[in-house]
Amino acid sequence: MERIHVAVRARPLTAEDAGSSPWRVSGNAIALSTQPSIRFEFDRIFGEECRTADVYGARTKHIVDSAVRGFNGTVFAYGQTNSGKTYTMRGSGNEPGIIPLAVHDLFRTIEEHLDREFLLRMSYMEIYNEEINDLLVPEHRKLQIHESIERGIYVAGLREEIVTCPEQVLEFMSFGESHRHIGETNMNVYSSRSHTIFRMVIESREKVDESEAGESCDAVRVSVLNLVDLAGSERAAKTGAEGVRLKEGSHINKSLMTLGTVIKKLSEGIEGQGGHVPYRDSKLTRILQPALGGNANTAIICNITLAQVHADETKSSLQFASRALRVTNCACVNEILTDAALLKRQRKEIEELRAKLRNSQSEHWEEEILNLRNTLLQSELEKERISLELEEEKKAKEQRDKRLIEQAKKIENLSSLVLNSERDDRTTVSSKNKRRLTWCPGLLSRQFDGQVLESVQEDPPSSTVRHGRNMEMPLHFEELIQESCESSIKHYTDAYSSGSLSCEDDSLPDSHALLHVTSRRKPNTMKKSDQEQLMGLASERIIPQELNDWKYTTQSQENIKACVNGLSARESEAILVIKQLEDQIKLLELEKSSFQNNLDDVLELATQQKASFHEKYEELQQNALVAQEQAKIANEKLSKQEAAYEFLTGIFVETESIAVQMDQSTRSVDNALSFIEELFQNLFMMAKNFTEAKQFVCGDITQFSSVIRDYENISNCLREKLSKLEMEKKILDEQSLDQKDELQRLKSSLESCEKAMEDCNIQNELEKDSILSELLTLQKEVVYLSSSSLMKEKESIRKELDRTKTKLKETENKLKNSIQEKIKLESEKAEAQREIKKLQSQRTLLERDLRKRDSFTVDKRHEQSVKSKELAGIYDQAVQIQEDYGKLEMHAFDMEAEIASLQEALVTTIAEKEEALSRVELLTSAVEDLESRLNSAESETSSLLEETAVLTRKLDASESISKKLEASISSLSREKEDMGIELTDVLLEMESERSTWTAKEKAYLEAKQKLNICNKNNCKLSEDLIKVRQELACCREQYSILEAKMIFSKNDTNEEKYCRETFEESERLLKKERNIDTGVNENELHQQLLSITEERDKLLSEIKYMNSVINESELIQAKATIDELSSRISIVEAKMKNDASAYNKENTKLRMQIRWMQPELDAHRGRLKEAINEMKLMDTKYLEASTKLKKDLSFYCREVLRLKEQLKESQVKAS
């Protein structure tokens, strides 16, 4: 069984499509970057820069080589329209496609096989709108699909051209391509509108010289190579198909949908369960039925485009290809063997065996074989002669029976004629009473006598010849005569005892009586020939005739008496009739006496013939007994030879099955299998020689001793080979240890990588905390600067911002380095996974080799034990071998357990690595958040700088106003020197107070805006809290699912504890979130603002009052109160900022913890799923191994019993 090989080839993209492509290819896997759960793995994935020759060398080259060896092969390209299928199959002038490469490679491999003759036939067809057209003969359209036992599924009327070179094939192909249906759509200028199937039929047989012509077996290998270019699936909305193009697209999509359903059902194993697979729903799947789950090597090339526009079509193509990976085929050599070819092959093998027997045995056995052949031939000739005699006797008996039936019919006809004539005579008896009455003329009597004479004179050739081939002895001649006499007497008595007849019927004479009457009329003129005829007639039928005559006379007398008593009117006429009848009775009595004399003579002749027949019968009986004994001897010899031939044929069948298995296994382990095949052939030949020697040389003790010596030599050779096998096993064990070391080294490297990742994470977290602290300090400083109006501090803030930018750039570089390290670790992980896969494949190969070698050694050891029982009784060694085999099995089970533990360790390391990668991703996301926050802080600082610039402008304006006021005050002071000074001071103080109040009002407005921003942030945080709670609810549900699964797994208690701890941590975090009462903070701030506004109103009223009164004491008190209020406002703002920063920190911490918890929960889910799958796999492997071991044990027990029986038979024959 071999699954379908699936390769994926991506079409090159433009620069625009390459930038927006959502697909990511890593090794032999492809996944969507937007949805990482959508991931596909295939046998090979070829990128955009690969060549068609690389695609051909991956699998198609092997399929072409196997087609030359007799295996069917199919390669087809699948994908959406405009994905490069036709380019892959046909190629271009610069780069040939799959079909030209396959054709050239096919002829090159044929030239390498010099020992065979080949005949190549090619055909080229298309399926257009569910109609099959012949591209080599365009007139042949609408061809039909048929199925037969000899040819399988084929297309009737399809032209097949015989080809001899690749150039001829490519010419026919280009001719067919010129007649293929091609159209133009919005997506492709040259779009294939039909499916094409390029088929090569390869017939081959062995080359035979004229001297070896009689020895060849005439076996012909016939294989079919299909290279299919499918039309692409398409959407009418994208292609813009209308009219004919729309109809073509619908037929293409329908056939591809049927292909998809067939692949799906085969991948699900519905055909093996007895379900229906719809091959007949489309002509494409009907033609490709042998390639889909049948007798062929199949490869699928899935062409895709990685552009964003075709993401859905690419996804569906990859899903089809992934389903095709699960479909398995059973490819085998297609060899046509006629009965003559089989006979030739068997004769050849028999002659080889005879030649070996001649080399190993003496001439005495050859003479005995020749004698046995002669006796067999003589017995066959005797059988043929006896069968011919029996056939001749059967024919003669059939002819005799036919003649007797004809004679009986003639006698009945004559009797009816005589009866009619008698009736006529009785009507005219009154007028013709003086005439002589005759019932039959002379000619009729003579004819009848001649016929009777012919029947009597026919003597059977040999009454003692046996009927059939049943070897039973015939009856004696006396018994046959007695049986005939008894049958005639019974017939007579039955006739006589039957009821009373009427007068008219009783008066009618019998046909035999008429014959006697005619003979009475002319007794003197009767010749000797007539007498001899009557004597011959009497030898067979005289007794029943006389009995009939006597019956007739008695009946006639009784009738006469009855008639005399009944006469009344015609007495005279009746008396005459009575007298005539009395005369007739007298004549009959005279004839009776003459017949009695004749009967005595006939009896004497019969006794003489009986004696002669008895002597002949005894001679034939003796000959038959001798022939029977010879036939028995020949049958015994034939049965022996047939048993030997059946045994040889059974061995031959077994060797063919084993050879097929060995051919299949040679692909993986060629060197080891070649050695095993040589050893198996040698042992098989030895076993054949031993069985034939045991059959032909049972009683010869000297040859038996030579066979024992040969067996000892064979056993020595086997021991040497067993020692070699044990050495190879040790080497394999060492290789497994090396692989274990490599696995440990990989584990250590993974651990070191994880440690490095953890260190990087710690450093990033520290840097993040430092950056956050610096940001907080900067925010505080910005707030402080907003209250002050010094330019130097602004410049220092800018410098610090530049420094933070440089630090952020450094952190970005570090993050980039960490990302690069992550990519390197991913590549190392992929390489490690590849190495692990390679190691696993090597392990499977080694296990397979070990199993085969173990089974082989077990078979050979059993054979040794049986032969030693037959020859010398080496039973202890077989027991030891079985114990060693058990130890080896235990060792194999230990190795499997170790491999399973290593696989589990690898799974855990991979999961841990994935966790580390998820943490790195989280760190990158955190850094991005920090960058966004820094950008927002920069924007805020820029806005603050703008505000400070506005404030400086206002200060400049206020200074100019103050200067003007000072000028006016100086002028007033001149006028009013006494009051001017005081007024100027008051005015200056009022102006300063107004400026401070305007600044405070602006600060109040800014605080209000910040409060609004805080409220918005609180709303956002509440929404985030709701989302977090929903995620926690999901986590709880997942945790409940995981907890239900954890009940079934006993060994995962640690993970369950870890999950519970994580759940408790999440609940604790929820409690913390619940404890954070945002509403309380908002209420406090609102109350503080209300108090501030009240104090502000009071101050405004006080200022108005001060303006009205203008007292110096009140102004001093107002200044004090203003200072106190400004300090309070600054404290409140600081508290609000601190609360907001603490709230943001706690929210970010909670989000980070939730994000960190999510991948851990996913990892735990994956671990549980993998553990469950591994348990299922282990159970299935254990069941399969136990069933195999049981079968092997039953088979070995049967062989032991059979060999014991053979030993007993050989001992009995020897004794």
UniProtKB/Swiss-Prot annotation:
Keywords of the record: ATP-binding, Coiled coil, Microtubule, Motor protein, Nucleotide-binding
Highest taxon above the source species: Eukaryota
Coiled-coil segments on the chain, per record: 333-414, 571-646, 708-855, 894-979
This protein's GO CC annotations: microtubule
Keyword check for Kinase: no
GO molecular function terms noted in the UniProt entry: ATP binding; microtubule binding; microtubule motor activity
Pfam families attached to this UniProt entry: Kinesin
Kinesin motor domain segment(s): 3-327
GO biological process entries: microtubule-based movement
InterPro entries given in the database record: Kinesin-like_fam, Kinesin_motor_CS, Kinesin_motor_dom, Kinesin_motor_dom_sf, P-loop_NTPase
Chain positions recorded as ATP binding sites: G79, Q80, T81, N82, S83, G84, K85, T86
Protein family per UniProt: Belongs to the TRAFAC class myosin-kinesin ATPase superfamily. Kinesin family. KIN-7 subfamily.
Full protein name: Kinesin-like protein KIN-7I
Organism this protein belongs to: Oryza sativa subsp. japonica
